[in-house]
Amino acid sequence: MLLDKYAEEIETSKYLDVCKQGVNVGLLSEAGVPAIADPGASIVKIAHENNIRVIPLVGPSSIIMAMMSSGMNGQNFAFNGYLPIDKSKRQKEIKKLEKKSYDYNQSQLFIETPYRNDQLLQDLLKILDRNTEVCVACDISLPTEYIKTFTVQQWKKIKLDLHKRPAIFIIHKDPLSV
């Protein structure tokens, strides 16, 4: 069965009818981890509401792998999902996340649809403070994997094509290094 962000709650509850009959089922995601920035979260919520046992299975998570390889604060971090598509709203959100990173010494992770990655990176380099660190982790676990962390000032000297490549972005403005 196919589930996407446009599915209605009534429709999604049908996915669990077989579970109510005692049949074990699995939830897979076409990219990433099920239910994390993924419409599968609605299925999991309905399962809990219907007292259906939910068992997470261990597997690779690009979010955690990016955080592990970033060199940024792994003690205090937040995953923010997708930033707004609207340019003005996205730019405001980037500033808000940078402030949050500085105020709480918290690494901020987010993702973008692969065909908008290049624009997001340009916005980061335009908006963030020159000393804010940015990690770009793309194609994680693929032969073309690229994971680098630099300051905004350093990133401005690098030409990187992220178009249609799955990527995680992390920013961190360390209050101790300002």
Positions of the model-derived regions?
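Short, hinge-like loop/turn segments at secondary-structure boundaries
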Residues: 17-19, 45-46, 70-75, 127, ...
